Amino acid sequence: MPKQTLDGNTAAAHVAYAMSEVATIYPITPSSPMAEIADEWAAHGRKNIFGKTLQVAEMQSEAGAAGAVHGSLAAGALTTTFTASQGLLLMIPNMYKIAGELLPCVFHVAARALSTHALSIFGDHADVMAARQTGFAMLSSASVQEVMDLALVAHLATLKARVPFVHFFDGFRTSHEVQKIDVIEYEDMAKLVDWDAIRAFRQRALNPEHPHQRGTAQNPDIYFQSREAANPYYLATPGIVAQVMEQVAGLTGRHYHLFDYAGAPDAERVIVSMGSSCEVIEETVNYLVEKGEKVGLIKVRLFRPFSAEHFLKVLPASVKRIAVLDRTKEPGSLGEPLYEDVQTVLAEHGKNILVVGGRYGLGSKEFNPSMVKAVFDNLAATTPKNKFTVGITDDVTHTSLEIKEHIDTSPKGTFRCKFFGLGSDGTVGANKNSIKIIGDHTDMYAQGYFVYDSKKSGGVTISHLRFGKQPIQSAYLIDQADLIACHNPSYVGRYNLLEGIKPGGIFLLNSTWSAEEMDSRLPADMKRTIATKKLKFYNIDAVKIAQEIGLGSRINVIMQTAFFKIANVIPVDEAIKYIKDSIVKTYGKKGDKILNMNFAAVDRALEALEEIKYPASWADAVDEAAATVTEEPEFIQKVLRPINALKGDELPVSTFTPDGVFPVGTTKYEKRGIAVNIPQWQPENCIQCNQCSLVCPHAAIRPYLAKPADLAGAPETFVTKDAIGKEAAGLKFRIQVSPLDCTGCGNCADVCPAKVKALTMVPLEEVTAVEEANYNFAEQLPEVKVNFNPATVKGSQFRQPLLEFSGACAGCGETPYVKLVTQLFGDRMIIANATGCSSIWGGSAPACPYTVNRQGHGPAWASSLFEDNAEFGYGMALAVAKRQDELATAISKALEAPVSAAFKAACEGWLAGKDDADRSREYGDRIKALLPGEISQASGEVKDLLLDIDRQKDYLTKKSIWIIGGDGWAYDIGYGGLDHVLASGANVNVLVLDTEVYSNTGGQSSKATQTGAVARFAAGGKFTKKKDLGLMAMSYGYVYVASVAMGASHSQLMKALIEAEKYDGPSLIIAYAPCINHGINMTYSQREAKKAVEAGYWPLYRYNPQLAQEGKNPFILDYKTPTASFRDFLMGEIRYTSLKKQFPEKAEQLFAKAEADAKARLEQYKKLAEG
């Protein structure tokens, strides 16, 4: 049986592909890779056990995927799907149907937390526990090897039992963990298949040659009996699963049972658990048993149907106390599901055993051997705590167990490494390659696990790698490391990088610093650790190499090469060969240029790696005096700072609000300093157009106006020039960047229209101190009121952006649109945001990029789910309209009351203009100013009325409702709701950030994806044309619709936004957003949008129903006949060139079709414009 190094998702996909004929799919983290892998294999013609290629169909949602599974099963095809979290919840209605009809299938679930008070993409069992009542059998895998083996068990057992299965494993901890495992080959799987059961399944299919009816409506006289008729199948299922497990054991030599026991044969204290925790608990149990403790573990494999007989069979007779661990929370219940099952079994069978239950690991919270020890210690207590939590500090309801002892249970001889990377720098990908190289080319076992934060890029990634001669069960993070690598120098001093490094260990740093500079650059505590632990210290300037070669910020291959050179895991010459082989495999479809650059990176890394010889005096390095910290809000000190220092696990429950509310305007405190280069203003070249500010994805560069008198005390480097324009006469102008908030994308410099660029990119290190002082001075300047037209680029950019310093990718094409909307309407905006990229860069705790102006006003932002965002926003609009109507009623009554003439005039003005933003604000401000005096003079009912108006005064200014999301939401999963909301006529504004892929889940195709584009779920290129969402919305006749592209036309974008917001009805703005998933250089993302329009790839138009009411043509075509080559545009993006490289004939056909579709679309729009 061959060994391969792969992750849990790949293991599941390997089996599902073999055993299925059809897969209906939809992306959701962390299950998406299963579907992506299946789609890619199908695109390349891989055969399953039936000798056929799996038919893969992407659906519009998980509900659609489950419905298609149901239909495919009903028609006689063995069908599977892959999902997690909210996706599984959307499948539940169909799961009841599939189970009720006894249709055999397997849903593979990378178990993940559900959205409650907050979204979490990380792992626990909340989703699968929500599906436990559907009638699906539920089989749990604890490791990557188990995923391979038990996936096969599930597929084999469902055929025999006719009961459908959920095969689940922990999201990220198992789905993304890389392990060296035995791979079951397809011909061996086929030998175990019950072919008679497959034939019987097909004979039961819907077939007009042998028709039958299913899915009837039943009355009270027979429904109950029919429901009970399936009992024998569920009673037989545990025995069938046990039988199949024995069959698989005969093939693999690995024995599984419905419940497996590990530990002392005479154990008195036992933990019952399932999922990856079992690996941690078993490792700990082995450690404790060696020390003489009578402890054990029962691993739950088959959770549904729960077999009391099989559970009791493995329970040692000596057991006195049991702790049941659940990785889910059921508020209001007497206990979590597994706990209640165990209690029931023991009570029904008269077992006098004390049982306590506890929760652990919610949202991928760390669960390690020290915590396992705490659970066993609790069981040993005189009165064990019940309904406990472990892994957190609960200082509110005091459920948590104390961790009294920290233990190291991992096998001796295991080499442990930690790598600190920057999101999008390639560190995680390189480490996955390293694991595979070591796993596939040595006799060592290998494990890799990767920790991310939620920033789209630029966040911290920590890779945990283990290698050793013994199997690795350590499904927890490394706290004692042999090697630690820091791939970004900005982490030095920010994080305790060397915490837990072993004496004599290795420290690898990527920095521009020379050996001589290290003494001044490294903090004292780091120098002390290096010297006292006698570390081997290496440095390499990977950024310099990457930039010289042309790889930009991608330092992955360079750092991987450096690792192999110093780690001595395998001979360096062999490692270099394997690295270059992996480069071909990873980047081959991206072209020879990319390949050669990466080959050069390997060679340069070998030459550039330098060992740093440090003085013994570092052992006595003295800490510098702490810098004076400016006064900060309590939230920043107690929540944001600890979380950003990677100390969030230490925060107690009392730190957090129970409803998930977080303050706004907190990203400005992060100061991540992740850019390599930042823009520096050259005032003599600047024409003061403000385009740089407009396109900045992170609002890091802004124009400032100041009165000369206010510049007293400015830093010497704070150079200004006379402001241009009569509106700014007598004022000074400056463009200023926030150096530590800039991500260094370079779009500002690229779009600068000056003959000689007014912005030049310079190394952050060289200018940080100067530009930080300049920025701090600029921010404290008094606000200058100017009358620049806010409907222009220049005027809009003098308004404060109320979206700043988000976690979006450098060069992001989405954020500039939303930032601009906040500059135009932000102080009265309410935003409903669909789950997706924009909810992650816009709403990842603890730092909120939405902020407030100097009056304390700013966007109120909320996110519900992926599929319901339009309805969520519509509900907001209904509520706001209701509140404003109540206010209008009260103000109307005030007109009849004995109030002052001035107050009455203000009320009359407001009632006449309440639906106009400017007028409602003007008269609303008058009412607010007059209210205190009116209230003080009033009495009785009039005073009560005025107090009621005062309570509702927040609704005096007209609110602007915005529904924001990506194309995956608008074109696919949320389209039904979006269509309904647009059809309703409600006064809402919809902004679709169209990246033409599901950007948030990794770049899967949507109905916005263009013909011929290669995306995940469209590995062979997309065959169908892009859905024309705008044209569909125009068909109503009363929806404002615009298609815009910031990089192509600023003026058209400004017109569209202002017209849409002003329009009294639904508006839809579809915005082209270049994305890293397109395979472009994000320094030129704005330029890429311009090219898209010039080539006829993306249309610019506005459809304004208001014009039709004036007797004019409502459709305005804002782009001309293409002036550039459509094909050249496609060849500038890897999402298209990769198809040409892999499938040249197919590419030619699809590219021709895409171009023809674009031309046909333009002709259609021209006809609309002609009326």
Swiss-Prot record:
Annotated keywords: 4Fe-4S, Electron transport, Iron, Iron-sulfur, Magnesium, Metal-binding, Oxidoreductase, Pyruvate, Transport
Cofactor: [4Fe-4S] cluster; thiamine diphosphate; Mg(2+)
Keyword Zinc-finger: no
Keyword Iron-sulfur appears in the UniProt entry: yes
Positions annotated to bind [4Fe-4S] cluster 2: C696, C742, C745, C748
Residues bound to [4Fe-4S] cluster 1: C686, C689, C692, C752
Residues annotated for thiamine diphosphate binding in this entry: E814, C837, D967, G968, W969, T995, E996, V997, Y998, S999, N1000
EC number(s) reported in the record: 1.2.7.1
Residues noted as binding [4Fe-4S] cluster 3 in the record, renumbered to the chain: C809, C812, C837, C1075
Binding site for pyruvate: T29, R112, N1000
Catalytic activity: 2 oxidized [2Fe-2S]-[ferredoxin] + pyruvate + CoA = 2 reduced [2Fe-2S]-[ferredoxin] + acetyl-CoA + CO2 + H(+)
Gene3D superfamilies: 3.30.70.20, 3.40.50.920, 3.40.50.970, Pyruvate-ferredoxin oxidoreductase, PFOR, domain III, Pyruvate-flavodoxin oxidoreductase, EKR domain
A molecular-function term among this protein's GO annotations: thiamine pyrophosphate binding
GO BP, one annotated term: electron transport chain
4Fe-4S ferredoxin-type domain boundaries: 677-706, 733-764
Cofactor binding notes: Binds 3 [4Fe-4S] clusters per subunit. Binds 1 thiamine pyrophosphate per subunit.
Chain positions recorded as Mg(2+) binding sites: D967, T995, V997
Chain positions recorded as CoA binding sites: S424, D425, G426, T427, V428, K456, N556, N598
Role noted for this protein: Catalyzes the oxidative decarboxylation of pyruvate to acetyl-CoA and carbon dioxide. The two electrons that are generated as a result of pyruvate decarboxylation are used in the reduction of low potential ferredoxins, which provide reducing equivalents for central metabolism. Also catalyzes the reverse reaction, i.e. the synthesis of pyruvate from acetyl-CoA and carbon dioxide. Appears to function physiologically in both directions. The oxidation of pyruvate by PFOR is required to connect glycolysis and the Wood-Ljungdahl pathway of reductive acetogenesis.
Subunit and interaction comment: Homodimer.
Family: Belongs to the pyruvate:ferredoxin/flavodoxin oxidoreductase family.
Protein name: Pyruvate:ferredoxin oxidoreductase
Organism: Moorella thermoacetica (strain ATCC 39073 / JCM 9320)
